[in-house]
Regions:
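Eukaryote-biased RCC1-like beta-propeller repeat architecture
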Residues: 1-423
Length: 423
């Protein structure tokens, strides 16, 4: 994505989380706005220089974008954000900075207080978000990786245990203690991924050449494994990280990626097999344990999607067309997503109950989408749900321009969608 990149957004925007400059839902894809970047001695020569978009994540009403700027020495990673910040999920000064202006609807660099708390020399290299909470992985040479959390703590989302006071919750950020997961004497501890559902969090770690998996937050449906109260009833939520054990030994077959729905969690192993935890009430786990050769995974709140050499498969609820095939059902068995054209899936992203797919068809890159569309998040100009995949980029009005504007990445959130277009 070295060429100048345009970020387009559609969908739910009540708190300005699309960064379109206002707080109206966008029913068609609209450019996201970036604030002008302050120039410093380490900044690129021009604030208009297009950065590389590393990732986009979002909660219920806030968005984080991890950007890489290239200067004369090395790439510089920054976190930009927009939307709702009342719980501190966008940093302690975010709301004060935007008071009286409409800057909550524009992406701007977040002022995060690491150095004020003694964390000097750390670089953010990964971000994640659940409903009203944000997570930042901090890395420094020859030090253990640090996981910081900030924002709301419903269902223990912050991962800091039973907070003894409101003052602790109002701290600018928190350090998630993972030492009991890997052991206090472990060396070379790296956090390789942080994945969230609406209210549960899963972390992949490596320490001393071994893999560990930890999680916290909502747990009632087994999405963190079988956690029980002394009474034998399911633990509603865990406010502190717990070890997640999988049926497949991760030391022999490590986990490459994790995705989370509302009440389920899915793990892709190096062998191409899948482990799954949590609720199957909507059929969201159907067929996963016998799948082979899986290349990529993702989850909506109540569904699971796997990419195989044979194509994109889906399982779970199809009440709003989420599975990309016509039969409507609150619970459907695993089957293929039915593109009406010959399609090679290059990338795909699941939102709360909708899906975007970047495909190659007849030598052209296009974005197709389907599922729940109440906020216009599929960018069709309509609020009607979409039962089978339809092309959403490029739209007919810009077909000729699209010959020089190529979709390169897609992301999806809670009723929100993003497309990165390279010119």
């Amino acid at each position: 994505m070295d060429a100048p990149t345009l970020l387009l957004a559609a969908g739910s925007n009540g708190r300005g989380q699309l960064a379109t400059g206002d707080s109206r839902d966008a029913h068609s894809f609209t450019p996201s706005k970036f604030a002008r970047r302050e120039i410093s001695s380490t900044s690129p020569p021009s604030p208009e220089l297009s950065p590389t978009i590393i990732s986009i994540v979002g909660g219920g009403n806030h968005t984080l974008v991890l950007l890489s700027w290239v200067n004369d020495t090395a790439p510089s990673l920054e976190v930009w954000g927009c939307g709702e910040g009342a719980k501190g999920q966008l940093g302690p000064g975010y709301n004060a900075d935007s008071e009286g202006r409409d800057e909550s609807a524009v992406l701007r660099p977040l002022v995060l207080p690491w150095e004020e708390q003694g964390l000097f020399g750390y670089t953010i290299f990964h971000v994640a978000a659940c409903w009203e909470t944000s997570f930042f992985v901090l890395r420094k040479s020859d030090q253990r990786d640090i996981l910081a959390s900030m924002g709301g703590n419903d269902f223990g989302d912050l991962g800091i245990g039973d907070a003894p006071s409101k003052k602790m919750i109002k701290a600018p950020f928190h350090i998630v203690d993972l030492s009991h997961i890997v052991g206090s004497t472990a060396q070379h501890v790296s956090i390789t991924d942080v994945i969230t559902g609406p209210h549960h969090v899963i972390v992949l770690l490596r320490a001393d050449k071994k893999q560990y998996i930890a999680g916290w937050g909502t747990a009632r449906h087994g999405q963190l494994g079988p956690l029980l109260l002394p009474s034998g009833r399911a633990l509603p939520f865990s406010p502190s990280p717990v070890v997640i054990d999988l049926p497949i030994d991760v030391q022999l077959d490590p986990v490459l990626s994790v995705r989370a729905g509302n009440q389920h969690s899915v793990f892709l192993h190096a062998s191409g097999h899948i482990s799954a935890l949590g609720s199957d009430a909507k059929g969201q786990l159907q067929g996963l344990r016998t799948a082979e050769g899986v290349q990529a995974i993702d989850c909506t709140w109540n569904g699971t999607y796997i990419q195989t050499p044979q194509g994109l498969l889906s399982t779970g609820t199809n009440a709003r067309g989420q599975l990309g095939r016509r039969e409507h059902a609150s619970k459907a068995l695993s089957g293929a997503v039915r593109f009406p054209v010959e399609a090679r899936v290059l990338d795909f992203a699941c939102g709360s109950e909708h899906v975007l797919a970047l495909i190659e068809s007849q030598g052209r890159k296009e974005v197709w989408g389907w599922g729940w569309n109440e906020h216009g998040n599929l960018g069709t100009g309509s609020l009607d749900d979409v039962n089978v995949p339809v092309k959403i980029w490029p739209p007919p009005a810009v077909e000729s321009e699209a010959m020089t504007s190529i979709a390169v990445r897609v992301w999806a959130g809670c009723g929100t969608s993003w497309i990165a277009v390279s010119k």
